[in-house]
Structure formats: structure tokens, C-alpha cells
Amino acid sequence: MTATPETATNRGVQRLHAAFARAEAEGRAAFIPFMTGGYPDAARFGEVAGDLLARADIMEVGIPYSDPLGDGPTIQRASEQALAGGTSTRRTLELVRELRQKDDTPIVIMTYINPIYAVGPAEFMRLAQEAGVDGLILPDLPPDQDLEIADLAAQHGLAVTFLIAPTSTPERVKLVAEACTGFLYAVSVTGVTGAREGAALGEVPRMLDLARQYAQRPVVVGFGVKDAATAQQVAQVADGVVVGSAFINAVAAGRDVGALADELAAGCRR
């Protein structure tokens, strides 16, 4: 991947690609922790997300949403708790802005499409840009169905990422791979998010090989990564490892999130 000068319209893309390049140069996959915005509450979110951000190559923050079809019970409960505590879409972006003032690590927002439309696509992109967001992960937006979102994101310097799954056809993988500007997100299993017992690579190597035929983009893997051993498995084939539910479970149990992040980050070494 050839580097290009950073401009207002490719800032997020360049920052994300630089993060992957640094991780690769150090012999590891990028470590990408996830936390639901405003969980367990707005004040604690800043502490927890700060601990994760300090150890991350890229941080993923989820917009809490009342109908998260792709999320398992752990992230659903986190969203419900955050929403009950008053964390709206706008408030999540304010929390990201506060994180950005303390740390320059790239941050991507995972959001379903409805919260974007509730705020207004142009306004959402403006707020995300002002908060220091580098990219968007859009799990329920087919890349060929709403080009306005991708165009607005690009205009505001935000990379866009779409998902592929083990059930994705080669034609679908090609479409998604070519539409992604930041990185490609491969779902390791069919179903919803969540740390799983016995999670294995399954169809992931095939998916990644196929995706890399169509686009020179980093490919990350998520859904089911729960510990250092699982992370190490994924790191052998992916450019980045996403861990979400394991951290939310740790917060709920009162465990040391920083220590868990250290373990999982170490697991990303090849």
C-alpha cells in the first residue's frame, strides 16, 4: 500500500493505515479493543476507554442503540445500560472528543444506520469529524445501497468499513472489499457478537484470502475473540484483532480492564 499525503478528505484513512503499518513492522496484528459509548456510565466510560486506548493500536467505540441486530446479549445489555444512563449518539461523540483530547490513537465508531439518520447524516459526520473520529464501521449498511453515507464520510475525512461473514459470496466479498476505505471487517462466525467458548478460525482464512484478491486494505477479524490464545490464533492470519464483549464482561465483573487488555495485546504478536 503506497502512502499518500494526508488531506482533509483522507485523514482518517491515512491514520488508520499508519496504525496497521506500525503494528506490522513490530511483528504483530493491530490490537483493536471495543467499548460501548457511555458504559457502564459516562464517567466510568472515560476511565475504562482511556485504559483501553492507552494499549490500543486503534480503538473502537460503539454508539448505544436500542435494536442492535448484530450484537449479542453482552453488548445489548451494555447499550441498554448506556441509553438508560442518558448516553445518546451526540453524547457518545462528546465522550470521544474528551478521549481524543488525552490520546491521539485512532478511534473508529461502530454504529447502526438509524442513529446516523436520527441525527442527520451531514450533521453526524460533522460532529464525528469535530470529535476526532477517524472512521466508521457500518454493520447494517450494504455498501451499494446508500452512497450518500460513504460520500459524506469521505468529505469529512472519515474512513468507512463494512463487514463480510462466512456466508458472504465471492461477489459480495468483492463488493465490500472495494467499498471499504479504512479496513475490511471479517466476522469470524455466523451470528452475533460475543466471546465464545471454543471460538476457532473456521472460514476466516478463506475469507481473508478472497478479500485480499480484491482490495489492498487491512483486514481485521472480530466476533468471538475472548482471550490471548484466541487473539493469537486470529493474529496469524489477520491484520487486526477486535475484542469487545470480553472487555464489557470484565467491566461488569469489576475486573482490571487494563490487565486484560495487556494480555490480549500480547496475544496479537505473531
Curated annotation (Swiss-Prot):
Cellular component annotations (GO), alphabetically ordered: cytosol
GO biological process: L-tryptophan biosynthetic process
Top class in the EC scheme: lyase
Catalytic residues (positions): E60, D71
Keyword check for Lyase: yes
Entry-linked Pfam families: Trp_syntA
Keyword vocabulary terms for this entry: Amino-acid biosynthesis, Aromatic amino acid biosynthesis, Lyase, Tryptophan biosynthesis
An example Gene Ontology molecular-function term: tryptophan synthase activity
Glycosyltransferase in keyword set: no
Family: Belongs to the TrpA family.
Known partners and oligomeric status: Tetramer of two alpha and two beta chains.
Function statement: The alpha subunit is responsible for the aldol cleavage of indoleglycerol phosphate to indole and glyceraldehyde 3-phosphate.
Record's protein name: Tryptophan synthase alpha chain
Organism listed in the record: Deinococcus radiodurans (strain ATCC 13939 / DSM 20539 / JCM 16871 / CCUG 27074 / LMG 4051 / NBRC 15346 / NCIMB 9279 / VKM B-1422 / R1)
